[in-house]
């Protein structure tokens, strides 16, 4: 990693005073001021939460990876942890029951999870009741923490992700909370196939999400995020490691499409491609495990990307995101597709 790999939102840890300079042999040769990487004067932290994704229970070391992450997050005193889908690899009863048993046995703080595309593979027609049974929450729901609202959206398939009812509910929830900070958790990033976007560095991952009639839903979903300026969108799906930012500025965080978008790698099998836009074959690191601890302040959040195996926070995945509230006038959202009843 070099200094040029950072983006404008990257910040040093709150406690950092200087940047160490090392030569190619790993020997420290000096230090420089933090400069633009200085942590802002943000005041006191309000609370923290965990943000992980793509557990894929039944694959490789997924169980031990999941337990390790839960144990660490509990020890770091997060208020709760959000899981951004793909709790299991196939979504069958055995895997979902195992997910529930691991959460029950290891999570000492609340877990708020949503369904990803892999969770729909067995019970597509009945996915809402299956997820409610094993994850202990409705298919889509809200959680409040102080003045903040967490909007949790499950998906029912890889094409059209939502029912009409869920998409309408999403609009109504954003409208009702338009002048509050809203953290939106939904599994799929906002790009179909190999469209380059946050979470799909250089378009190197092929995603089936948003295909077919899902294309219209994608238009609506993006327009909702862009209109309701106080929202921050968290997603997983591609598994791509944090280090891909070295090859693509928008790999992990982006706001160039009019909304704040945050990519969460896989907690159990992150992908470690070299960043080439032609590298679309999976290169899973089954020994790896990455995710976020998110520190919340009055006017911003500190995203702290972590390697759960090495036990380190990663400089390339440390971001300050300004969330100063903006006024959104009531009844001003317009849907060009006619999907949403306003």
Outline where the language-model segments fall:
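Short, intrinsically disordered N-terminal pre-domain segments
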Residues: 1-18, 301
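N-terminal active-site segment of His-dependent metallophosphoesterases
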Residues: 15, 22-97
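A short C-terminal boundary segment appended to hydrolase-like catalytic domains
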Residues: 42-43, 281-342
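Alpha/beta-hydrolase fold active-site loops
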Residues: 47, 79, 140, 147-148, ...
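Active-site neighborhood of phospho(di)ester-bond hydrolases with catalytic His/Asp-centered motifs
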Residues: 51-53, 80-86, 110-117, 153, ...
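Solvent-exposed loop/turn segments at secondary-structure junctions
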Residues: 55-58, 87-90, 117-121, 156-160, ...
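Short acidic, glycine-rich surface-loop motifs adjacent to enzyme active sites
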Residues: 84, 177-201
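Extended active-site neighborhood of metal-dependent phosphoesterases/phosphodiesterases
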Residues: 93-178, 205-211, 216, 220-227, ...
């Amino acid at each position: 990693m070099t200094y040029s790999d950072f983006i404008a939102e990257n910040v040093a840890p709150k406690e950092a005073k200087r940047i160490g300079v090392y030569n190619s042999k790993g020997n420290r040769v000096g230090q420089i001021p933090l400069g633009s990487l200085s942590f802002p004067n943000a005041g006191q932290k309000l609370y923290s939460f965990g943000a992980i994704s793509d557990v894929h229970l039944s694959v490789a070391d997924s169980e031990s990876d999941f337990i390790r992450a839960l144990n660490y997050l509990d020890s770091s005193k997060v208020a709760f942890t959000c899981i951004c889908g793909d709790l299991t690899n196939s979504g069958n009863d055995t895997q979902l029951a195992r997910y529930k048993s691991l959460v029950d046995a290891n999570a000492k703080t609340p877990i708020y999870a949503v369904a990803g595309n892999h969770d729909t593979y067995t019970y597509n027609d009945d996915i809402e009741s299956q997820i409610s049974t094993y994850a202990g929450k409705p298919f889509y729901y809200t959680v409040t923490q102080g003045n903040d609202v967490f909007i949790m959206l499950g998906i029912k398939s890889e094409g059209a992700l939502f029912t009409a009812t869920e998409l309408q509910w999403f609009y109504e929830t954003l409208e009702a909370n338009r002048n509050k900070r809203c953290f939106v958790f939904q599994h799929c990033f906002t790009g179909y196939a190999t469209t380059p976007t946050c979470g799909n560095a250089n378009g190197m991952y092929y995603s089936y999400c948003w295909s077919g009639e899902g294309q219209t839903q994608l238009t609506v979903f993006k327009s909702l995020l862009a209109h309701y300026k106080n929202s921050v969108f968290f997603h997983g799906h591609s598994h791509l490691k944090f280090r891909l930012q070295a090859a693509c500025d928008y790999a992990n965080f982006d706001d160039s499409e009019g909304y704040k978008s945050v990519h969460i790698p896989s907690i159990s099998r992150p992908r470690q491609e070299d960043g080439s836009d032609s590298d679309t074959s999976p290169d899973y690191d089954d020994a790896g495990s990455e995710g976020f601890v998110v520190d919340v302040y009055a006017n911003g959040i500190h995203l702290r990307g972590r390697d759960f195996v090495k036990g380190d926070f990663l400089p390339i995945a440390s971001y300050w995101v300004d969330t100063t509230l903006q006024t959104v006038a009531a009844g001003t959202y317009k849907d060009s597709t006619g999907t949403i009843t306003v």
